């Protein structure tokens, strides 16, 4: 859709490529995080498919945190070890680091309430989370679509990259 392509292109200064879409069917109550830790160079388009409010788990963001420090996999490597699950590594190592950056930034968190069909665009460095769901079991359908610039050399996965024209390419990482 040109309605999404144009603002993404304007933000990137380059053509966007889709790299991942996730469907949240209820509020996630996800810890604070930065998408670029997982998806280098990304920007997110969070599309509400239902009304999103405090009852069903609003998106929470720290305004201005996209200008702050990015936690990278060099800072906090998560490895597949038998002694500790990936989820435990995030809980014990990654999320506490994000909380430190959150405090460094010094800005308060705000809730984002949206109507069905609204799109929230945000930088992949923005610290965000899912708020507590007040009405358990209430639906909160949202798509979290992640994009990177066409020229991105920082993409570290062998996933397909799909343009808004439907062209699919895989830019394989080097083994260097």
Regions found by a protein language model. Name each.
Residues 41, 58, 71, 131-133, ...:
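Short, function-defining helix-loop hinge/capping sites that tune catalysis or transport
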Residues 1-62, 66-68:
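Conserved double-stranded beta-helix
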Residues 41-46, 69-74, 84-88, 145-148, ...:
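Glycine-rich loops and low-complexity Gly/Arg-rich segments
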Residues 31-42, 107-108, 114, 138-139:
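A short beta-loop-beta micro-motif enriched in histidine and acidic residues
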Residues 8, 109-113, 143:
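Extended, compositionally biased low-complexity polar/Lys-Gly-rich tracts
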Residues 38-54, 113-116, 121, 146-151:
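Short, conserved beta-strand element in jelly-roll/cupin
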Residues 75-78, 116-121, 125-176:
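Non-heme Fe(II)/2-oxoglutarate
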Residues 54-127:
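Double-stranded beta-helix
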């Amino acid at each position: 859709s040109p309605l999404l392509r144009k603002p993404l292109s304007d933000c990137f200064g380059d053509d966007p490529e889709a790299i991942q879409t996730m469907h949240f069917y209820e509020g996630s109550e996800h810890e604070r995080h930065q998408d670029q830790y997982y998806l280098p160079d990304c920007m997110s388009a969070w599309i509400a498919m239902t009304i999103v409010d405090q009852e069903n788990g609003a998106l929470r963001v720290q305004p201005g945190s996209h200008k702050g420090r990015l936690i990278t996999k060099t800072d906090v490597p998560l490895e597949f070890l038998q002694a500790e699950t990936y989820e435990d590594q995030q809980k014990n190592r990654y999320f506490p680091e994000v909380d430190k950056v959150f405090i460094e930034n010094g800005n308060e968190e705000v809730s984002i309430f949206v109507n069905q069909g609204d799109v929230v665009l945000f930088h992949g460095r923005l610290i965000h989370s899912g708020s507590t769901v007040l009405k358990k079991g209430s639906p909160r359908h949202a798509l979290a679509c992640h994009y990177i610039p066409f020229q991105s050399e920082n993409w570290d996965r062998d996933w397909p990259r799909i343009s808004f024209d439907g062209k699919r390419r895989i830019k394989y990482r080097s083994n260097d």
